[in-house]
Design a protein with these regions (language model features):
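Transmembrane helical core of 7TM receptor-like proteins
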Residues: 1-344
Length: 344
């Protein structure tokens, strides 16, 4: 795999990434990998596939509903909900990479994937996950400005600045995804063609990578880790100042209202960070464990599933927007029935 980065005169960055349809494994050219999955029994494979499909559809519906509410309701046209809509989009795209492919493999009992398909999974999942970290960082900065500098909020968090922060988050995510993919697939593999996972993820591919060729992989991984640590530090500092400011509010009602806007974001960030750290910071081993696959399920499914629930559970604005949407749909349905009843 080759990755070329071109810097244009106008400041634009162009990526040219090419992935070969075959790689070298133990001096033998191969064209794909095999997933280990959760079971070797065909019936259990089908059950697992259907279970994942139900979870996937539920996550998609919840995130699409939240995106629809934010888009249609005028009261939700604020920077906080703009970031939340982009977070839901990233969650939606992120979970759509591994789960549909796993469902198809479970139904067809075919656990193989091509080199191009595996590289695409690594690129997309790394891009969306990295972009989500930066969007979460932008959301913490938004809450910091709203609570610690409310008089300057409209100027600092203008629509142009919000679009810029989200655009930079997506762009950095794509760039990191390209670096990860190039680092992994630019060198030959020395292990088995069986990936001890149900999708192509970086730790599993590290298990079958040449130990003496891991310098390129760890270099690209180190860049992402450093940027991730910068994001974590920014979020921690933001909430340190937020909590210090909130505790100075004289009334309990004011403190509760301020905490209510921050705790959902902090909860989402903690879940995302905890699951990602377990999966990606764990030292790769040569033995596959069912525990690793179960935690990968939590990493790929849990944050996208819980994010809409956490943000709407105690959010009166989202609940009000949902009631308005239901009333509009019911009124349109009643009007349609009335027109049909009085028609010729």
């Amino acid at each position: 795999m080759t990755l070329e980065v071109h810097f244009e005169n106008n400041g634009a960055i162009l990526l040219n990434m090419a992935v070969e349809d075959s790689i070298v494994l133990n001096d033998t050219r191969i064209t794909g990998f095999f997933f280990m999955g959760f079971s070797d029994v065909p019936e259990l494979q089908t059950v697992c596939g259907l279970f994942f499909l139900v979870m996937y559809l539920a996550v998609i519906m919840n995130n699409l509903l939240l995106i629809t509410l934010i888009t249609l309701d005028l009261k939700l046209q604020t920077p906080m909900y703009f970031f939340l809509k982009n977070l839901s989009l990233l969650d939606l795209f992120f979970i759509s990479v591994p789960i549909p492919n796993f469902f198809i493999n479970s139904i067809t009992h075919n656990n193989s994937i091509s080199i191009l398909g595996c590289a695409l999974q690594v690129f997309l999942m790394a891009s969306f996950a990295s972009g989500e970290v930066f969007v979460l960082t932008a959301m913490s900065y938004d809450r910091y400005i709203a609570i610690c500098s409310p008089l300057h909020y409209e100027v600092i968090m203008s629509s142009g600045n919000c679009v810029l922060m989200v655009g930079v988050s997506w762009a950095i995510g794509v760039l990191l995804g390209a670096f990860y993919t190039a680092g992994i697939f630019s060198k030959p593999f020395c292990g088995s063609i069986v990936i001890p996972q149900f999708f192509c993820d970086i730790p599993s591919l590290l298990r079958i990578s040449c130990s003496h060729r891991l310098v390129v992989i760890y270099a690209s991984f180190g860049i992402g880790l450093c940027l991730g640590m910068v994001c974590v530090i920014c979020i921690v500092l933001s909430y340190f100042h937020i909590f210090s400011t909130v505790l100075k509010i004289p009334t309990n009602k004011g403190q509760s209202k301020a905490f209510a806007t921050c705790l959902p974001h902090l909860t989402v960030f903690s879940i995302f960070l905890a699951t990602a750290c377990f999966v990606y910071l764990k030292s790769p081993s040569n033995t596959a464990s069912i525990t690793d696959r179960l935690f990968s399920v939590l990493y790929t499914v849990l944050p996208p599933a819980l994010n809409p629930v956490i943000y709407s559970l105690r959010n009166t604005d989202v609940k009000c927007a949902l009631r308005n949407l239901q009333q509009n749909l019911c009124s349109r349905g009643s009007l349609h029935l009335t027109v049909q009843s009085i028609g010729p």
